[in-house]
């Protein structure tokens, strides 16, 4: 008997058996073996798709992460206190958001005396570091290794390049007393929402978040209000972020938070530990 269009199953794959395979079983076996020689998945990311590795592999990975933290902590230990500025790497000099980031960072450095910290790259990051430098303030960056290398901008007094995004985000929060968010893409949204989550869950407290660019973030504001309406966040959570276009209002908001919650002082290096500022 010949079955046209019969399905056979082998492991997790299904095969359509044509008339030749059903009448000649050896052809069916040959077709399965030929298929098994082909990769089931894209081999471009084998590390992430292999699942748990050996104990030695996991230990080496943990040590690499630990070393990244040590490098970052040592490099940035005397950089603070900082205000961290986030935003797109794609805006060029002369763009509205580039110039606004430059202005806000200039005011923070000159009026509040904080170090400006960024991701160390181009665009908004460059503008923020540039504003701090022009104000005579300190300017530092925590860069990230990418497949298409993101070089540090020329306005950094100190920088460190980190391999892992999650290590970098910890460092950007650790030395900061506030975040200023400018328009950006996935990375900027990731940093914004992670910080909002940390504040909402009390992992960090009394941490002002200022979002600059009300036109750009108008859909986000609407979505946050929708979330509050649906009950997935509390109405009070809407107060975690200040949306504004006013540089003076942004600086005043940060100053109010810090004046009422912190005594800020810069750490000094210890000569007996061979530390450098």
Locations of the language-model features?
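Amphipathic, Lys/Arg-enriched alpha-helical "gate/interface" segment within cytosolic domains
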Residues: 32-46, 76, 147-159, 166-169, ...
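Fold-independent oxyanion-binding glycine-rich loops
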Residues: 87-89, 119-120, 142-145, 162-165, ...
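Acidic/glycine-enriched connector segments
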Residues: 123-182
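Glycine-rich beta-alpha loop segments
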Residues: 28-42, 46-142
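N-terminal amphipathic/hydrophobic targeting modules at extreme N-termini
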Residues: 1-14, 20-25
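Short coil/turn connectors at secondary-structure junctions
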Residues: 79-81, 111-113, 135-138, 156, ...
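Active-site/ligand-binding-proximal alpha/beta "capping" segment
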Residues: 163-215, 261-263
């Amino acid at each position: 008997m010949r079955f046209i269009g019969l399905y056979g199953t082998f492991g997790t794959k299904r095969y359509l058996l044509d008339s030749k395979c059903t009448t000649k079983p050896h052809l069916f076996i040959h077709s399965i073996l030929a298929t098994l020689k082909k990769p089931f998945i894209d081999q471009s990311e084998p590390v992430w798709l292999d699942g748990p590795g050996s104990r030695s592999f996991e230990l080496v990975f943990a040590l690499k992460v630990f070393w990244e933290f040590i490098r970052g902590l040592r490099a940035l230990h005397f950089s603070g206190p900082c205000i961290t500025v986030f935003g797109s790497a794609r805006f060029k000099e002369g763009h509205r958001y580039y110039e606004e980031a430059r202005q806000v960072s200039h005011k923070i450095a000159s009026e509040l005396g904080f170090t400006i910290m960024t991701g160390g790259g181009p665009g908004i990051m460059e503008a923020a570091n540039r504003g701090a430098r022009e104000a005579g303030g300190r300017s530092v960056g925590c860069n990230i290794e990418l497949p298409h290398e993101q070089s540090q901008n020329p306005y950094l007094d100190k920088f460190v390049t980190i391999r892992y995004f999650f290590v970098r985000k910890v460092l950007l929060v650790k030395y900061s007393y506030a975040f200023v968010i400018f328009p950006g893409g996935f990375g900027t949204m990731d940093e914004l929402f992670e910080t909002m989550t940390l504040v909402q869950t009390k992992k960090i407290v009394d941490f002002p978040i200022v979002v600059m660019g009300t036109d750009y973030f108008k859909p986000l504001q609407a979505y946050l209000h929708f979330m509050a309406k649906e009950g997935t966040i509390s109405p009070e959570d809407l107060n975690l972020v200040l949306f504004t276009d006013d540089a003076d209002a942004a600086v005043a908001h940060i100053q109010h938070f810090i004046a009422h919650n912190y005594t800020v002082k810069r750490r000094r290096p210890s000569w007996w530990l061979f530390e450098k500022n």
